[in-house]
C-alpha cells in the first residue's frame, strides 16, 4: 500500500525544463473549473476523467508528456494510464509547485 502511494505521489526526478525544450507537453488533469482558476502557461487541460478516451489523440502528438494536477495524485494516476498505453510520461505533481529544474 505504501509503495502504491509513493508511486502515485512521486515527482519523477526529471529535468522538466529540458523535457519541455525537447517538445514535452504538459497535461493538466484537473477539472476545467480548476484549470480556469489558474494553470501553467502552455498546459493543455485534459481532465483525468477524459484521459482514457484521449489516449489515441495524445499518442498522435508523438511527444513525451508531463502530467500535473492540484496535489500530484490525479497526475500520478494519469501518468500510469498513459504509460500503460505506451506514452512516455512523467508526473510533474502539483501544478502550482511545478518547477523547471
Regions found by a protein language model. Name each.
Residues 2-16, 22, 32-64, 73-101:
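Rhodanese-like catalytic fold shared by cysteine-dependent sulfurtransferases
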Residues 26-29:
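Short hydrophobic beta-strand that contains or immediately precedes a catalytic carboxylate
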Residues 69:
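Short cysteine clusters
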Amino acid at each position: 500500500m505504501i509503495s502504491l502511494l509513493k508511486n502515485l505521489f512521486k515527482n519523477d526526478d526529471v529535468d522538466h525544463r529540458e523535457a519541455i525544450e525537447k517538445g514535452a507537453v504538459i497535461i493538466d488533469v484537473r477539472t476545467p473549473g480548476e484549470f480556469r482558476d489558474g494553470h501553467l502557461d502552455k498546459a493543455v487541460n485534459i481532465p483525468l476523467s477524459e484521459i482514457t478516451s484521449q489516449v489515441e489523440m495524445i499518442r498522435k502528438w508523438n511527444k513525451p508528456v508531463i502530467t500535473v494536477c492540484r496535489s500530484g495524485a490525479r497526475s500520478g494516476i494519469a501518468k500510469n494510464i498513459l504509460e500503460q498505453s505506451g506514452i512516455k510520461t512523467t508526473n510533474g505533481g502539483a501544478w502550482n509547485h511545478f518547477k523547471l529544474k
